[in-house]
């Protein structure tokens, strides 16, 4: 399956950050046509490719979360893993695309769906115009090679804004920088680790040292756990940093502080970021909320949050509770990009995949994931049997993202076996 790895390395040469996927769209469309597929592209940029009389559709998304120096992605191999130098790797979901490309070169009866802008609220699949010919859909966006996903979390974006003015003051100005945070990972898959949030740690540091905020921003993406944060703050007394917050004296002089200082700090410090409910039966997070980003610009304090739940009632509840929390502090709040969870069950496709997967991973099992999968939305648009698999990808959505090469080989074999059995 070396061609899968080569396919992936070639994909990494093409910029495909979310919202900036035009070059990748053109590449995949041309590739499919060259392999004899009939291709159509809808308004959202979703690419549908079909050849012969297929029974199964393979599906992956072609945008990536760009962190660090991405879209420049310099791939290298180290200790059996694919990594990227100073950037996210894009194995989520580039490896899935690479496997589909290999299958397109091999099979005469195949249907493929490449979806756009999955990483920004599953935008592409939510606007999907294509109707699939196949009755089974195999999604290749999972990140653990001993599991078959038949359920996933739904999600909703939440924004909270508060106007502020400034007050003139004079004194000592300190620059704060978050440091040593392991965050930046996927806010669904990695939220169970209970890693510290850079935004919350900085707010606590400022509050405990009686600081007055001049500026404060933190976080990277709505679906990444906050890793970075920085602030300019006035402290009356000399302040020293700690293991999480680097504190540097800048100067003494005049400045303007935020008149909503206490409300801003109280909002962050009182908010319960992270896991809210856990499913003991499936051993996965059931409901969570990610306090993702904070910005202060144009006299506006703006938070973005991402709520997830694997049950419909749980998602509606966390959305309601979060909005009421911010309203109580006087914020203007809105929610958008709501998509329901996929509360699936084992089916004929998952049974076929499990049989093939057990040959390479004897402990393979059927489960659900605390993250969004597009097949959950597609199966609500038309009647389909769905399942999701993928190779081991560690720390997606971060500069530490890495993908296990032998795991890619395993999943590639499984995909090819399932396709051959349904040729």
Question: Where do the protein language model's features map onto the residues?
Answer:
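Alpha-helical metal-binding/catalytic segments enriched in His/Glu/Asp
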Residues: 58, 78-121, 172-180, 185-209, ...
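His/Asp/Glu-rich mid-to-C-terminal helical/loop segments that flank catalytic regions of hydrolases
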Residues: 13-16, 195-209, 262-272, 277, ...
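Zn-dependent metallopeptidase/amidohydrolase metal-coordination segment
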Residues: 60, 288, 292-299, 306, ...
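N-terminal capping segment at the start of a domain
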Residues: 1-19, 184, 335
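A conserved active-site cap/scaffold subdomain adjacent to cofactor or substrate pockets
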Residues: 198, 222-279
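A short beta-alpha structural unit
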Residues: 8-13, 221-224, 230-232, 250-257, ...
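A non-catalytic alpha/beta surface segment that caps or lines the substrate-entry region
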Residues: 16-54, 367
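Acidic/histidine-rich catalytic neighborhood of metal-dependent amide-processing enzymes
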Residues: 93-167, 213-217, 276-282, 286, ...
């Amino acid at each position: 399956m070396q061609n899968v790895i080569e396919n992936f390395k070639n994909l990494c040469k093409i910029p495909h950050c979310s919202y900036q996927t035009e070059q990748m769209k053109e590449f995949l469309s041309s590739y499919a046509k060259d392999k004899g597929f009939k291709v159509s592209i809808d308004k959202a940029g979703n690419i549908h490719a079909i050849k012969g009389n297929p029974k199964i559709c393979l599906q992956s998304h072609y945008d990536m979360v760009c962190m660090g120096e991405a879209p420049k992605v310099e791939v290298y191999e180290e200790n059996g893993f694919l990594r990227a130098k100073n950037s996210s790797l894009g194995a989520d979901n580039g490896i899935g695309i690479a496997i589909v490309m290999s299958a397109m070169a091999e099979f005469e009866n195949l249907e493929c769906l490449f979806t756009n802008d999955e990483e920004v609220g599953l935008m592409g699949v939510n606007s999907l115009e294509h109707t699939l010919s196949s009755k089974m859909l195999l999604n290749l966006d999972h990140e653990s090679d001993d599991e078959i996903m038949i359920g996933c979390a739904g999600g909703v974006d939440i924004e909270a804004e508060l106007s502020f003015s400034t007050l003139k003051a004079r004194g000592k100005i300190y620059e704060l920088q978050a440091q040593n945070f392991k965050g930046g990972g996927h806010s669904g898959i990695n939220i169970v680790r209970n890693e510290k949030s850079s935004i919350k740690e900085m707010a606590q540091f400022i509050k405990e040292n009686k600081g007055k905020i001049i500026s404060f921003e933190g976080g990277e993406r709505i679906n990444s756990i906050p890793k970075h944060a920085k602030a300019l703050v006035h402290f009356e007394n000399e302040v020293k940093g700690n293991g999480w917050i680097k504190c540097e004296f800048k100067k003494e002089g005049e400045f303007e502080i935020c008149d909503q200082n206490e409300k801003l700090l109280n909002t962050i410090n009182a908010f319960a970021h992270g896991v809210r409910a856990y499913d003991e039966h499936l051993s996965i997070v059931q409901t969570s909320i990610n306090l993702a980003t904070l910005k202060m610009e144009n006299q506006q304090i703006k938070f973005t949050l991402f709520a997830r739940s694997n049950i419909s009632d749980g998602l509606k509840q966390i959305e309601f509770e979060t909005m009421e929390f911010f309203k109580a502090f006087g914020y203007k709040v809105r929610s958008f990009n709501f998509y329901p969870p996929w509360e699936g069950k084992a089916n004929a496709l998952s049974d076929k995949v499990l049989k093939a997967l057990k040959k390479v991973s004897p402990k393979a099992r059927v489960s659900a994931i605390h993250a969004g999968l597009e097949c959950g939305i597609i199966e609500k648009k038309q009647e389909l049997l769905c399942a999701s698999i993928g190779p081991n990808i560690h720390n997606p959505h971060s500069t530490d993202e890495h993908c296990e090469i032998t795991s890619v080989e395993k999943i590639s074999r499984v995909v090819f076996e399932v396709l051959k059995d349904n040729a």
